[in-house]
């Protein structure tokens, strides 16, 4: 009978950290690793199954015989089974055969596998990475610019349906083909980042990747691990950051996955009032179990370390934070204080964000969090969860509600489009128009818009303009940028043929120009999360559905004036106040003919010394229907700059004097 040699990659300290929930490098120790022991090449296996009666490795190398290669339980009662099997290596297909305490046999994939068979096959594959990265300068610059303001315009992509190949059975692009086609497109469109919906291995394609079984493996539907590395490397070479959707909120009940891994609930909560997710018929991680915390945070750092990912967007955070999420009374258990907050999940998220910030400065974590849970993007040392950004679901809901209304009724709902400014700076917000808004009979963004064909496109351009010029960053799901007419389908992909039509090309050009204006003007992004970057001119012209506001960068940056007009009336002369005189040049106008508009544009305007909206100067311009205009002011006059500098110096002197007085007072008391 073949034997398994005793060999371990784990030290006693590793095990202690693992059991304390503080081992965040488990991917280097657990799972399968090609090694050499006593001159023999083979594979070392290590798996956590604390309640198993026996664990063996089965595979194509032993005819899937569960009695052939039985692993050794560690002496320390850690629940880890391990051993070395000589004569096998990279590419070996395997599973763990787990005999439960009840005598049943379960065939499980490796939770730490770096590659899996292509679904519907479910076995793991021994893999060692072989890729030479070329993004040293990108990583260095990312680290050095950590915590500095930067532009964030994100293109959300479902890798399996961004583009299909009809001539080849309507198959999806693989990762290398995406590097050749998606990266140049994102670069041309001016997006700063691409966010991939989950690339981790998942058995059910229509889950879009959110039902993960292989947390440490990119889906083999799209190629090998090195192919994804090549895609990310190509993005970095093009100056594009890469974000991955990460799903620590739940996992599916597929029997080759984490559910009942050793016949008991070790990865999920044992009580289904906490452990079962009613929305997705999936299972909730036990965030109070230290081994699970080590597993999840190791997984997050794995993608950052070995795949050079620039950020993780954490899915369904709200479902993690509350025990009663989507549960009726009597279907959930309160925490130890009688509340509904999941204290273990809150603690886990803080640990996760601290680990990312410490190990990978410059990497962003983004929360999809739909409730009013406080301080999601505040530092953990201030009591926050520590995320870098949070999706602004309130803006999305209110804005879509507003834009769905026929313009004639919008005058009575101005609050829907302005309310977001009440709380815009309470968190660091990312404004989402994501995949969730264009599925499940919600219709496409274009078909949410009211009116005839021209009005639908004009409304859509105005919506995008408002999203881009609103404080915060923005994310747009693929297809939205060309005004897709149908809902997104993972089987059909983006309707690229629509670019044959003028209006659709116009929307695409509009998004491209929005991105280029956004990235090139610090006023659009430098103070994206600070009230310093935004100033109301007017928000109360409800009759005409007009908003006017300023976007501001640093002191020496040119100021942008944004005019939103969400009604169908054309006004030959509309006046708004401006903060100073000089020339105000129209740098963007969604009614330009190249975007599919009617062609009412303004060019450069000289400010008048006519007071308006509490300002000493004003400009008067043509205001097209259903549009967004952006004017750029001249640099602040030298006298204004000088006054600002003098005022700053005066304030600093006062502060220093006050501090000295306070210090002297304390010295006198002592």
Where is each model-derived feature located?
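Intrinsically disordered, polybasic Lys/Arg-rich low-complexity tracts
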Residues: 639-670
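Conserved, mostly hydrophobic/aromatic
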Residues: 47, 96, 157, 186, ...
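C-terminal beta-strand-rich structural cap/linker in extracellular carbohydrate-active enzymes
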Residues: 90-94, 603-642
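Conserved alpha/beta catalytic core and glycan-binding cleft of carbohydrate-active enzymes
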Residues: 120, 308-310, 325-493, 498, ...
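The feature marks proteins involved in alpha-glucan
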Residues: 1-44, 74-156, 161-170, 177, ...
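Short proline/glycine-enriched turn/loop motifs at strand-loop junctions of beta-rich domains
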Residues: 48-55, 579-582
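Substrate-binding/active-site clefts of carbohydrate-active enzymes
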Residues: 117, 138-152, 158-341, 621, ...
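Solvent-exposed beta-strand/loop surfaces of large extracellular or lumenal domains
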Residues: 61-80, 591-614
């Amino acid at each position: 009978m073949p034997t398994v040699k005793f060999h371990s990659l784990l030290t006693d300290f590793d095990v202690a950290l693992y059991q304390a929930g503080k081992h965040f490098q488990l991917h280097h120790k657990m799972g399968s690793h090609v090694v050499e022991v006593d001159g023999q090449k083979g594979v070392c296996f290590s798996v956590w199954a604390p309640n198993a009666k026996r664990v063996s490795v089965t595979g194509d190398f032993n005819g899937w015989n569960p009695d052939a290669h039985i692993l050794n339980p560690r002496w320390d009662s850690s629940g880890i089974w391990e051993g070395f099997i000589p004569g096998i290596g990279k590419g070996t297909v395997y599973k763990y055969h787990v005999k439960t305490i009840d005598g049943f046999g379960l065939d499980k994939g490796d939770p730490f596998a770096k590659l899996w068979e292509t679904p519907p096959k479910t076995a793991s594959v021994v893999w060692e990475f072989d890729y030479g990265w070329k993004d040293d300068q990108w990583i260095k610059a990312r680290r050095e610019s950590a915590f500095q303001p930067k532009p964030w315009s994100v293109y959300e992509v479902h890798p399996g349906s961004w583009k299909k190949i009809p001539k080849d059975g309507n198959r999806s692009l693989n990762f290398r083909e995406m590097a050749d086609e998606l990266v140049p497109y994102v670069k041309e469109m001016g997006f700063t980042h691409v966010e991939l919906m989950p690339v981790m291995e998942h058995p059910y394609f229509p889950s879009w990747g959110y039902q993960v079984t292989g947390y440490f493996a990119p889906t083999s539907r799209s190629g090998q691990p090195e192919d994804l590395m090549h895609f990310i490397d190509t993005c970095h070479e093009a100056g594009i950051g890469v974000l991955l959707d990460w799903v620590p909120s739940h996992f599916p009940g597929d029997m080759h996955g984490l559910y009942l891994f050793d016949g008991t609930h070790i990865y999920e909560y044992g009580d289904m009032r906490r452990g079962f997710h009613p929305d997705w018929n999936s299972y909730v991680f036990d965030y109070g179990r230290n081994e699970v915390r080590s597993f999840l945070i190791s997984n997050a750092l794995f993608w950052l370390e070995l795949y050079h990912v620039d950020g993780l967007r954490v899915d369904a955070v709200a479902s993690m934070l509350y025990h009663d999420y989507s549960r009726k009374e009597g279907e959930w258990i309160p925490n130890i204080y009688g509340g509904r907050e999941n204290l273990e999940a809150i603690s886990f998220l803080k640990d996760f964000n601290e680990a990312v910030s410490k190990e990978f400065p410059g990497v962003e974590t983004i929360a999809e969090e739909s409730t009013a849970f406080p301080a999601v993007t505040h530092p953990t040392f201030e009591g926050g969860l520590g995320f870098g950004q949070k999706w602004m679901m309130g803006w999305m809901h209110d804005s879509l509600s507003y834009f769905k209304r026929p313009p004639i009724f919008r005058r009575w709902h101005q609050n829907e489009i302005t309310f977001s400014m009440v709380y815009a700076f309470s968190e660091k917000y990312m404004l989402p128009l994501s995949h969730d808004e264009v599925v499940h009979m919600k219709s496409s963004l274009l078909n949410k818009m009211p009116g005839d064909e021209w009005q639908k496109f004009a409304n859509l351009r105005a919506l995008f303009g408002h999203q881009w010029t609103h404080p915060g960053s923005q994310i747009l799901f693929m297809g939205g940028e060309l005004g897709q007419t149908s809902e997104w389908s993972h089987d059909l992909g983006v309707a690229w043929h629509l670019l044959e039509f003028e209006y659709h090309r116009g929307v695409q050009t509009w998004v491209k120009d929005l991105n280029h204006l956004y990235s090139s003007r610090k006023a659009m992004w430098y103070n994206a999360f600070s009230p310093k970057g935004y100033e109301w001119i007017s928000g109360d012209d409800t009759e005409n559905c007009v908003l006017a506001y300023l976007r501001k960068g640093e002191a020496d940056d040119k100021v942008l004036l944004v005019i939103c007009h969400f009604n169908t009336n054309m006004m030959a002369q509309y006046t708004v106040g401006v903060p100073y005189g000089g020339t105000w040049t129209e740098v963007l106008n969604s009614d330009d003919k190249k975007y599919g508009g009617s062609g009412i544009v303004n060019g450069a305007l000289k400010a008048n010394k006519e007071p308006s909206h509490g300002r000493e100067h004003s400009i008067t311009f043509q205001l097209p229907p259903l549009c967004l205009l952006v004017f750029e002011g001249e640099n602040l006059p030298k006298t204004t700059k000088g006054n600002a500098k003098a005022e700053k110096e005066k304030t600093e002197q006062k502060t220093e004097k006050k501090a000295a007085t306070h210090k002297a007072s304390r010295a006198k008391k002592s």
